[in-house]
Amino acid sequence: MKCRRIWTTIFWLLPLSVAAELLQPEIGLGWTNGWVREWRRDVPGLKVSDCSERVSESLIKVVRRWTWTGTTPLERVTLSVRYRVDGDAKTLKPFIPGVLLYGNPSNKGRTDGRVPVFAGEPGEFAIFEEHRVPMPFALLEDARTGAFAALHVLPSPVRGAKREDLWWSIGVETASGGADIVMLSGPVGYNRRWSVVKALQNAAMPYDETYITLLPGQIVEKTFWIETGTATAEEFGFEQALDVSLALFRPYDAERFEKFGDIVKTKRKFALSRWVEGPVPNACGFDMYDQHYQWRHLTIGWCGCAATCGYALPVLNLDPSDWDKAQRSLDFLCDAFADTVQTDGLFRVTFDMKTGQKTGADFALGEAVGGDAVSCGQGLYSVLKAIRFAERGGKGRLDTSKWRRFAMKVADAVAADILRNDWREPDSTGPGFLVAPLVVASEMFGRPDCLAAAQKLAGTFERKYFGYDAVYWGGTLDASCEDKEGAYAAFQGYLELLRNAVASGNAAAERRYARLARHAMNMMLTYTMVWDATYPPGRLSDHAFKSTGWTVVSAQNQHLDAFGVLTTPEIWRMGEYLGDERLKRLAAVMYRSCFQLTEDRKSAV
């Protein structure tokens, strides 16, 4: 690597698809009213140098080094990296995976701390701890020209911090004549509030005094990569940055996790531990809760597994008794909820085993109304897949008559509702979970209206989300923001439409849905951890937890969850269609990594 003062020449080293430059380093000194007191370019005794290496035509690696040569500690210091992108800040769309997706337009104008937003207005900033960013990069993409610049970073905690477990931060802020991608040695803030973090669901949490102290002779180094490029018809800027992030971190080692076969057997054992019967006559199925919990609920979709097991157990075929449980559970669900199907096809999704009451998804809120599109779509998809397997590979061991009647009733009603002239387009992508089952129903029941409805619904998502003005959102039932579940809804639907197009030989539809499926999948994948964060002393570090393969929930709920496991079959299928082994290897890591933190009792740690 070449080491020199490169901040005045770095933009000459990259293609000029975007007017941008690495700014001269500034050092923050002092701390007043929750932020850096002043910024200086020269601090006597503090040496700053950059070492650079060209990785590819569009990517340069930089290691910035700060060396404190003073004889006494330098206190209340903030180190920084700034990359200036010229242009209109309002059209420079910021993308920080899992945190700020093109500015989180679904919450445009929000000023509280629930969801971060960024519209490029004067004085705006959005800066977050690196450990919250699953694919550690920040990007600015010009919505008019497609030109973009991104900083990829090697995440790290900071030595010499007053606060325990302080990490570097990364984000964006507006500047004169453009916007900056910034990296700071700790300070954070968003929605025009300095020194707050997104650590609570509905509010910002104060996070002050994020400065450091440099000791005599101390050296601090920060590794980052500068990427520039231009969006194309085949790849937006965030998709190109995703490819670079995967190449840099290579999150493909599945062998350090439990074996796939062992995981499947354990999951089956856990599912069977939830099997319940009565006291309501003939009621049986897979409980949403542990046996010791006060409630006995069969719940379809979302966090419930009531319909899923009826499909999965016969496919696995690990024990003859599993087929009987699959038959009985789906028979009961289809009987129990058939009379709750509304004219729009939605139905109640929770059955109380003690009282026989049928409610919506969130029983705790007393939702005695129809279910939501997310849960109903996921539940219908499970029933249809169970029918498809039973009739293709079940060898007559399963009776699908009740399943067919229920699925046909729901699919016909959903399709009729969507095809109405006065149908109201959904605000979010959550109803996208209806697309995939509609495609399957159209083939299974010979219902062209179901396919037409699936195409109409998918078309609304294409118009809204295949661009910069809106991002897939609203798939998480306990949040209202950009989220991976909304992207998954679109991806799953597009993938079924792609399969249908391939099967029918419709080349134009295949090209269209292949691109849309890849876009939605890539947006979904940006929520996936591609690196192993380190953790302070506690149960996560006790178990040497590896975060690679887990997923950030949403812009509002910036914590890790195992939901990404549900997406792995589709990621694998997309990898097969594209001939992309990376996707298949990543899917394997996601599935196997998310088995961590499971005790012998098979309950979450």
Predicted regions and their residues:
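Glycan-recognition and catalytic cores of secretory/periplasmic carbohydrate-active enzymes
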Residues: T232-V605
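Carbohydrate-recognition beta-sandwich/jelly-roll modules
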Residues: L22-W403
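Hydrophobic h-region of N-terminal signal peptides that target proteins for export
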Residues: F11-A20
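Generic secretory/membrane-interface signal
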Residues: K2-C3, P15, P136, I300, ...
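Short, intrinsically disordered, low-complexity terminal segments
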Residues: I6, L16-S17, S504
